[in-house]
Amino acid sequence: MDIKKVAVLGAGAVGSYVIWGFSARRDIELGVVADGPRGERLKKDGCAINGKIYRPAVWTPQEAHDADLLIVCLKYGALPSALDSIKAVTGPHTTIMSLMNGVDSEDIIASAVGGEHLLYSLIKVASHKEADGFHFDPATTVGIIFGEKEPPCDSPRVKAVEALFGGTELHFRATDCIQEEMWSKFRLNVCNNLPQAILGAGVGCYRDSVHMKAISDGLRRELEAIAAAKGIDMQKVDAVSGKGCAVKPSARYSTLQDLDAGRHTEIDMFSGTLIRMGKELGIPTPYNEFAYHMIKALEEKNDGKFDYTGPNQEMTWAK
């Protein structure tokens, strides 16, 4: 099995790492899947990554059809509306890797195209947007981790993806416990993204404040209880996958980056998913419920819901 045609859906913070890595390979077809105004903009402007403009092909979903590998790098909220595009790209032999945050994007994609196309995967990259495009440190990036959900773990497509990535500067490794790896990353996201997003401070806050550490630990306990109830043994991967990329204490992870930019966040994928699973399993999730509602309120604040200047002066009172 050889991978010669690679399609990337989503050219943001995560997609930029993939585009950067594969652009050095001249023996494959590489394209970003986009149509309409976004597709025209990518054709015109390219992808600005680490101070350089990259110009992969830009394919409509139909032009990308039957790609050997489709890598999905979307925000969680964009996935439902992208399922038709994913179906259009997917051919009989297409392998799909979802590098989205969370633990259920594979299930959502499988509902549209069939689970046999999914090679489970995750990415750890501290990528952020600046005025001149997306930036990340290739040297400190943990990279892409992937594996089969069920044995055999050394399947032909795992070997094909290893061979493909091996000809790039991308950091990667295959694993035989991909679900535990995904939950380990999910834990990093929930426990590190959410409290700092509420406070509006860099990640050094967890080191410097026992109060921030206490909130992070509360979120962690709830997630680990849910994982255990679902048969996920986090200890399988703690030694090799318990940490993210090295960053400065001023670093702001994706949820806070979204709030800083006035965008809605992926809180439904983080605490929203854990609240739903907790209810299904009878496990209380008070820390996640608080984080969920606080970040939803911060989104409302960004939307202008709490702008009480001008004529919006109807009297209210504490209740």
Question: Predicted regions span which residues?
Answer:
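Rossmann-like NAD(P)(H) cofactor-binding subdomain of soluble oxidoreductases
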Residues: 51-135
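Glycine-rich beta-alpha junction loops
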Residues: 37, 101-103, 122-127, 150, ...
